[in-house]
Regions:
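N-terminal active-site segment of His-dependent metallophosphoesterases
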Residues: 1-70, 76-82, 192-193
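Active-site metal-binding loops of divalent metal-dependent hydrolases
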Residues: 1-4, 42-45, 74-76, 107-108, ...
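Active-site-proximal loop/helix segment associated with metal-binding centers of metalloenzymes
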Residues: 6, 120-197
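Metal-dependent catalytic neighborhoods of phosphoester/phosphodiester hydrolases
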Residues: 9-10, 42-60, 75-99, 108-124, ...
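Soluble or luminal CAZymes and related metallo-dependent hydrolases
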Residues: 15-22, 49-53, 84-88, 172-186
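Short amphipathic alpha-helices and their capping/turn segments at secondary-structure boundaries
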Residues: 25-31, 55-62, 93-94, 98-141, ...
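Structural motif
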Residues: 37-41, 69, 144, 197-199, ...
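Conserved beta-sheet core of the metallophosphoesterase superfamily
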Residues: 69-70, 141, 203-245
Length: 245
């Protein structure tokens, strides 16, 4: 939850140069404090041009030395009321891939013991048997299953409150959460054997009809603007880096 528009407003930016300067400071902090794999969990900006600028600055500053995984937040959908979730996702994915970064939308990222890495997309995950996926991930050291998650299971704060502006309605939101949750449930027996991160914009209770944390997984999310960190060795919830406000 970087919320760059708020950061720019708070910095008193009056020109493009001011904006670039403000974003570069944020990017420098991210690069300096990151190593290996960095998760950027949505609500970067509701303005696509600003998102684009941020990604370009990040790619230039990181020099390809780090791996960046993104998921979309509800704010990333605001600017595209005439596009479907799939088309919006493709738009962001194309931008990120141009700069060597990854977008997860019901997809699985893996990194194996030889430091090879890649994405298994939703369409492929849906068709694979668990035996096939187990073989595919045989050498993986880390897997990240990620997506927006949406808020289909949150009856109090959801699309009816305008959290996607006019782009995603309640029916679509519920369908998208079911899509993610159903795949999550299918993958559980395979991911149980791996070092697994469940990476979503919204917390598990918003997208899952049975929001019970798996003892071996780390759950990373944002959206709430209330930082939470909990790790008792059995339940691991890392939602403590929401820094945009």
């Amino acid at each position: 939850d970087l919320h760059l528009l708020h950061r720019i407003q708070n910095a008193g930016c009056r020109s493009r140069e001011d904006v670039v300067f403000a974003l570069q400071k944020i990017v420098d902090t991210i690069v300096q404090e990151s190593c290996g794999i960095t998760l950027i969990g949505g609500d970067v900006s509701s303005n696509f041009s600003l998102f684009d600028l941020f990604v370009k600055l990040l790619a230039h500053s990181a020099y390809g030395s780090q791996t960046f995984l993104f998921v979309l937040g509800n704010h990333e959908f605001w600017e595209f009321p005439d596009l479907s979730v799939e088309h919006i996702t493709d738009k962001y994915r194309k931008l990120l891939e141009e700069h060597g970064m990854y977008l997860l939308q019901n997809d699985l990222f893996y990194k194996n013991e030889f430091d090879d890495m890649g994405i298994i997309p939703y369409a492929e995950l849906e068709q694979m048997t668990n035996a096939e996926l187990t073989e595919r991930l045989r050498c993986s050291r880390l897997v990240v299953f990620g997506g927006t998650g949406f808020s289909g299971c949150n009856v109090e704060f959801n699309a009816n409150n305008g959290i996607y502006w006019n782009t995603v309605d309640r029916e679509t939101e519920i369908q998208e959460s079911k899509k993610f949750d159903n795949l999550y449930q299918k993958l559980l027996p395979v991911l149980d054997q791996k070092n697994t991160v469940i990476f979503t914009h919204t917390p598990q209770k918003d997208w899952s009809s049975n929001p019970k944390s798996h003892a071996k997984f780390v759950y990373v999310s944002g959206h709430t603007h209330r930082n939470v960190f909990y790790d008792d060795g059995e339940e691991r919830i890392y939602a403590d880096n929401q820094i945009g406000y």
